[in-house]
Amino acid sequence: MIHLTLLSSTILHYFIFLGDTHDQLLMNQERLFADVDASLMAFANEMKAKNTWNSVTLIETSDFARTNSPNGNAGSDHAWGGNYIMMGGGVKGGQLVGTYPSLREGALLNIGRGRMIPTKSWESVFLPIAKWAGVDEVDFDYICPNRKSFPASHFTPASSLFDLS
């Protein structure tokens, strides 16, 4: 499934569904990662060829994460805490932002079967992207409707994600 939405003159939302890993995760994951890798590489190469790479940020997300422990079908089930991949000409790459939790069973953020409680909301990353993209501050509540539920320290500073020079 593919879905494309223009959110503003500077923000485009693009959705593609590649499949699921409830069954046979190890057998399917390498192929799925190769598909994602090839797609991200093709996108980056096209943006560079069009000389727009420095004004583009791509963020790869999921509406849910996967459990770290296998289910009965050698797959992985839905969970909460997950990761994002960001890339673009202005992105400060090669870093992990945030604190990666302990994956061992019984760890503070592991509530069982490898289901991790997130330590950051998606707004903590989307708000600095909106700032970088030049979204007016009056629209922040529309883009990140839960942002007032968190202290300012919850949000990743745009300077941690982007080269702002």
Model-predicted regions and their roles:
Residues 17-165:
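Feature marks hydrolase-like catalytic cores characterized by long aromatic- and Gly/Pro-rich stretches
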Residues 1-20:
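Accessory "access/gating" subregions that flank catalytic or transport cores
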